[in-house]
Amino acid sequence: MKKLFLLYAICLLAFPTMGQNSEYIDLGLSSGTLWKSVNEEDFYNHSTAMKKFGNQLPEKQHFVELKKECQWIWKDNYGYKVIGPNGNSILLPAAGSRSFNGNLTNVGTHGFYWSSTLDGSVQAWGLGIISNAVTIINYYTPSCLSVRLIQK
């Protein structure tokens, strides 16, 4: 029962409900980029994410800046609280990913986020989070990952 409740809580954090108001948060980053306060509702492959969100997807450089300029605090079974230079924060949930067969994997332990930056013809850069690491890494573009939008 505890695991079921935990999974439900993670899903609530990772997937906003329809019509929920969300805002863009100023973390005080040197670029002036604002980060949306919540993830988009679903997991997306790279092509679909690009078509649906376009220039609202962060570029690789935005993840590099976020990693470099912010303080990252792991919240057990939830993800990272990311605190900007000005003290404002966002939560990047460890929402896992959706496998090719449609199953959710790594919920509560890993988070994977697309950038708009391609790395060759079948990979794109993204942000990967686990309890002891935040990495900028390339992912296979058909993978279904989380999306966190920005405002430039």
Locate each region found by the language model.
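C-terminal, surface-exposed recognition/capping segments
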Residues: 20-23, 27-29, 33-50, 54-152
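Sec-dependent N-terminal signal peptides
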Residues: 4-15
